[in-house]
Amino acid sequence: MNIELIVVGKTDMREVEALVSMYTKRLNHYVRFAITTIADVRNTKKLSESEQKRLEGEAILKLISESDHLMLLDEHGLELRSIEFADMLQRRMLSGTKRLVFVIGGPYGFSDAIYQRANSKLSLSKMTFSHQIVRAIFTEQLYRAFTILKNEPYHHE
């Protein structure tokens, strides 16, 4: 199975980029993992929130194939403990999913078209995090999930 994380906009926080890079390298030991960054929408001051979400959504949909399992990282998604997240990943792998795509939306969330296309939603917390910090949290949790599946001594209950 291939796993991809799609994010809107580049991060300007070197510390976040360093963490994401570190966990990406570690993850590639277990699974093919890639991050795709969609360029920020230009001239956002002239756009409504819904127009910005629509444009971001169009860019995201261009990267998704019909057979992909699309999971949105969304505040209204299912909350899982790390072990439950690992179990969900294992079920996806066993079900024959070829490409599992996670998406971190832009500052206003996702367009209706993205919500309609999504197969599921996952929440990392009831708290709100910046979209930049979510990249580091998510890649760490993904790495943690694979160490759980391999019974490696990273995760402690």
PLM ranges: what are they?
Residues 1-27:
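N-terminal beta1-alpha1 ligand-phosphate binding loop
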Residues 2, 97-102:
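Loop/turn-to-beta-strand initiation segments
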Residues 112-156:
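Structured adenosyl-cofactor binding patch, chiefly the S-adenosyl-L-methionine
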Residues 11, 75-78, 106-109:
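Short glycine-rich anion-binding loops that position phosphate/pyrophosphate groups of nucleotides
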Residues 32-33, 37-98:
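S-adenosyl-L-methionine/SAH cofactor-binding core of RNA-modifying enzymes
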Residues 105-106, 117:
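Proline/glycine-rich low-complexity loops and linkers
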Residues 6-8, 36-38, 103:
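Short hydrophobic segments within beta-strands
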Residues 5, 71, 105, 138:
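Conserved RecA-like P-loop NTPase ATPase core
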